């Protein structure tokens, strides 16, 4: 979204939060509204679609610290009549007539103000006024307006997140018009260079001792004119539609991680570059596996004899099973490490598999098993083994 539109919109009100809301409050408000207003949940309701777009625009600005700071500064600058309504008082008596076109007293439009800033490459008000008062009076061609960034969410199984997965992602957003391929012109025609400004998008004017540039009124600052607009997009080059894109989720993605898909965001007007799409990944917990960074964790139930006498366990991994040797006399709760069988790393290779052994006590014993265990207990006592020897809880 261009800066010029920020003056006219209250993004905080759009999301229903205060101007000092925390990032988490903004995120929660956006998620709730996006869920309620999503076109898939409101088929045949264009009003909900427009509201969904407005909420997405507000979140796009307020969720980015740099954009939010710039937005707040812009609102403060123009709040309370600082530049007053639709007319700009030059402070030079009536000499400028409100910066009118040709000195006829026409009102100054704030949209023109920001268009001028965009064309001169400036991002500050100081740069803007420097251009208006003749500091660097050459007009530059207007830059195409990049589309907004978009955000969406998806949910993955634990194994899908660990190994990576290719998946279709369905979203509803402004996209290049399929009828005119984003040009805005009716198929078979093309935009023409504006003859008034020769494609620069601005007109240079001199008024007394001052020179300044203003947007070309014929092409509205775009530098081109569409004589025959596309019937589908009405000349914007953009239509809101539902599309499906194939997304490759890289191996090792973590819960809450954002993935950037360049150029998959909202389409720019008249063939301008598209914004980016940010996908927040949510990972469902797994019944078997856990994760510690790039290490894969698993807890395996074992018997007392497997720990006391030693054994080999068949342990699940992301790719089949692996045999893990349990040394004789292994303690309950010990972690056994299997190198290279964990979660794939972005830099190559994989983390380790961490196997925790946990004794499973039989709830009931009878017959030969009970007799054998009782005989073992007697032999253990006679050997002098005391599991609580040296325990701090002894009194």
From Swiss-Prot:
Zn(2+) 1 binds at residues 177, 180, 230, 233. Its cofactor is Zn(2+). Zn(2+) 2 binds at residues 194, 197, 216, 219. This is Chaperone protein DnaJ 1. GO terms for biological process: chaperone cofactor-dependent protein refolding; chaperone-mediated protein folding; DNA replication; protein refolding; regulation of gene expression; response to heat. A zinc finger (CR-type) spans 164-242. CXXCXGXG motif repeats lie at residues 177-184, 194-201, 216-223, 230-237. Participates actively in the response to hyperosmotic and heat shock by preventing the aggregation of stress-denatured proteins and by disaggregating proteins, also in an autonomous, DnaK-independent fashion. Unfolded proteins bind initially to DnaJ; upon interaction with the DnaJ-bound protein, DnaK hydrolyzes its bound ATP, resulting in the formation of a stable complex. GrpE releases ADP from DnaK; ATP binding to DnaK triggers the release of the substrate protein, thus completing the reaction cycle. The lineage of its organism: Bacteria, Bacillati, Actinomycetota, Actinomycetes, Mycobacteriales. GO terms for molecular function: ATP binding; heat shock protein binding; unfolded protein binding; zinc ion binding. Homodimer. Belongs to the DnaJ family. The gene is dnaJ1. Pfam families: DnaJ, DnaJ_C, DnaJ_CXXCXGXG. The J domain is necessary and sufficient to stimulate DnaK ATPase activity. Zinc center 1 plays an important role in the autonomous, DnaK-independent chaperone activity of DnaJ. Zinc center 2 is essential for interaction with DnaK and for DnaJ activity. Was identified as a high-confidence drug target. The keyword Repeat applies. Keywords: Chaperone, Cytoplasm, DNA replication, Metal-binding, Repeat, Stress response, Zinc, Zinc-finger. Residues 10-75 form the J domain. It is found in: Cytoplasm. It comes from the Bacteria. Its main location: cytoplasm. Binds 2 Zn(2+) ions per monomer. It comes from Mycobacterium tuberculosis (strain ATCC 25618 / H37Rv). GO terms for cellular component: cytoplasm; peptidoglycan-based cell wall; plasma membrane. InterPro entries: DnaJ, DnaJ_C, DnaJ_domain, DnaJ_domain_CS, HSP40/DnaJ_pept-bd, HSP_DnaJ_Cys-rich_dom, HSP_DnaJ_Cys-rich_dom_sf, J_dom_sf.
């Amino acid at each position: 979204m261009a800066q010029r539109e920020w003056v006219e919109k209250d993004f905080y009100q759009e999301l229903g939060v205060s101007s000092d809301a925390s990032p988490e409050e903004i995120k929660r408000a956006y998620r709730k509204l996006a869920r309620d207003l999503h076109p898939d949940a409101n088929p045949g309701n264009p009003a909900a679609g427009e509201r969904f777009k407005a909420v997405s625009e507000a979140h796009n600005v307020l969720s980015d610290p740099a954009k939010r700071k710039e937005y707040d500064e812009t609102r403060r600058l123009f709040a309370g009549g600082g530049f007053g309504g639709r007319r700009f008082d030059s402070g030079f008596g009536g000499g400028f007539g409100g910066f009118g076109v040709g000195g006829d007293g026409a009102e100054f439009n704030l949209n023109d103000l920001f268009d001028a800033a965009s064309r001169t490459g400036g991002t500050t008000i100081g740069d803007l006024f420097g251009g208006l008062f003749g500091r660097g009076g050459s007009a530059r061609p207007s830059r195409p307006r990049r589309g907004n960034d978009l955000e969406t969410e998806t949910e993955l199984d634990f194994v899908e997140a660990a190994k990576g997965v290719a998946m279709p992602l369905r979203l509803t957003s402004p996209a290049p018009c399929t009828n005119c391929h984003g040009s805005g012109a009716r198929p078979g025609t093309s935009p023409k260079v504006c003859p008034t400004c020769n494609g620069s998008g601005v007109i240079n004017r001199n008024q007394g001792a001052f020179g300044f540039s203003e947007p070309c009124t014929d092409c509205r600052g775009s530098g081109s004119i569409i004589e025959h607009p596309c019937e589908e997009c009405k000349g914007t080059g953009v239509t809101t539609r539902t599309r499906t894109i194939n997304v490759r989720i890289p191996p090792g993605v973590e819960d809450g991680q954002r993935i950037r898909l360049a150029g998959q965001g909202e389409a720019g007007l008249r063939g301008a570059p598209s914004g980016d799409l940010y996908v927040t990944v949510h990972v469902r917990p797994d019944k078997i596996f856990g994760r510690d960074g790039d290490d894969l964790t698993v807890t395996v139930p074992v018997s007392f004899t497997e720990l006391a006498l030693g054994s080999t366990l068949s342990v699940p991994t992301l790719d089949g099973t692996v045999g893990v040797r349990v040394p004789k006399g292994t303690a309950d709760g010990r972690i056994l490490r299997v190198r290279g069988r964990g979660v794939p790393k972005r830099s190559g290779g994989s983390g380790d598999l961490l196997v925790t052994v946990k004794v499973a006590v039989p709830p009931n014993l009878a017959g030969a098993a009970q007799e054998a265990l009782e005989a073992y207990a007697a032999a253990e006592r006679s050997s002098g083994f005391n599991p609580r020897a040296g325990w701090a809880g002894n009194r």
